[in-house]
Amino acid sequence: MQGNTQPREDLLQFQQSVYNEMNDSVNRRNMLEQLVLYYGKPQYWHDLFQLARNEKGLSDEQQLDIVRLRLLVGDLKVAGDFIEGAQSALVADYPNDAKTILDKGNQAKVLNAATDERVGRLVKMTNDRVAADGAKQAELQQKSASDANASVKLGLIYWTYAKHKEAETAVRAGMKGKLADPEGAKVALGHTLLSQGNKPEAVNAFNSVARTSKWASVARLWSIYARRA
């Protein structure tokens, strides 16, 4: 993103460094968000992810959403990153996300199921969960007519299989009902819109998340990514 109002990189770097020395994570994060938005360097993303991951009280879904974005921008580097990311996806019940993460780790020659027994077990568990995912989707489809939460979950599962339009439809249907996590549904909608190339609408969805929500920091990360995409 370029423009007349673009802040100077060196000044942002200096300010975030000062806030880091002061242990002021809120203002440091604000500076890092601007560095990522305007300059997008891998180190800025990495530092911003570190702050996000250190936030207390994140749910399994929120932690996984950070992993998803780290994968997209190339912040998963070592075997532990990919293994932890895949485990997060399994815990949150998105086995195809776990498969995607493990496949990327294999392609990057960071993971090797043939020589690492731990990776081999994780790959097998993931493949077994993916094989059983059809039944899970069928169950959610049945529930979704009367359960808004099931509809949003189904939409996110569709999204992990690149069924983007079906995902959007399911999430929107769920948002019409009573949800346990309405702010999370807004992030889910943003995902489905961004996947279809609807960037302005996706940004609006991410930005609509309440600032007081635990989803707020995750939504800001995705909003920045969508604005740069």
What positions do the PLM features span?
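C-terminal soluble interaction/assembly domains
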Residues: S146-A229
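Flexible, glycine-rich surface segments
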Residues: G80, A89, I101, G105-A108, ...
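Generic helix N-cap/helix-start motif at coil->alpha-helix transitions
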Residues: G3-F14, N23-R29, Y38-F49, S59-L64, ...
